[in-house]
């Protein structure tokens, strides 16, 4: 189980990304569209004043159950350990143990 503080920090980042998503995409689009250097610099300055954690690049995928960041399966939102246990218990419909 990951530390509670790490899980909460990641949750805070997710909220910030959602809060500033429209503003950030608008500013990036305007930087690309504007042919004038002064306006580009002005938009860039506004973009830099946004919180760092509002950038989607700073998000990490974490397991919904344990908060583990490594061995994460995007399709399920779970780490490999939890995925294996839940599959064995039958909590994931359609997931079967492979054999050939």
Swiss-Prot record:
Subcellular location: Plastid, Chloroplast
The entry's keywords: Chloroplast, Plastid, Ribonucleoprotein, Ribosomal protein, RNA-binding, rRNA-binding
Cystine bridges: none
InterPro entries in UniProt: Ribosomal_uS14, Ribosomal_uS14_bac/plastid, Ribosomal_uS14_CS
A Pfam family: Ribosomal_S14
GO biological process, one term: translation
One GO cellular component term: chloroplast
SUPFAM superfamilies found in the cross-reference section: Glucocorticoid receptor-like (DNA-binding domain) (SSF57716)
Highest taxon above the source species: Eukaryota
Record carries keyword Plastid: yes
UniProt key word Cytoplasm: no
Single GO molecular function: structural constituent of ribosome
PANTHER family assigned: 30S RIBOSOMAL PROTEIN S14, SMALL RIBOSOMAL SUBUNIT PROTEIN US14M
Subunit structure: Part of the 30S ribosomal subunit.
Biological function: Binds 16S rRNA, required for the assembly of 30S particles.
Family statement: Belongs to the universal ribosomal protein uS14 family.
Family matches, as NCBIfam families: PRK08881.1 (NF006477)
The protein, known as: Small ribosomal subunit protein uS14c
Organism in which the protein naturally occurs: Oedogonium cardiacum
């Amino acid at each position: 189980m990951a530390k509670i503080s790490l899980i909460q920090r990641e949750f805070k980042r997710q909220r910030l990304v959602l809060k500033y998503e429209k503003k950030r995409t608008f500013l990036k689009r305007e930087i690309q569209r504007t042919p004038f250097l002064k306006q580009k610099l002005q938009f860039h300055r506004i973009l830099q004043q946004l919180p760092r954690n509002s950038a989607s690049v700073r998000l990490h995928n974490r397991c919904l159950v344990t908060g583990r960041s490594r061995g994460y399966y995007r399709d399920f939102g779970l780490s490999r350990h939890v995925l294996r246990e839940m599959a064995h218990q039958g909590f994931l419909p359609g997931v079967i143990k492979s054999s050939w």
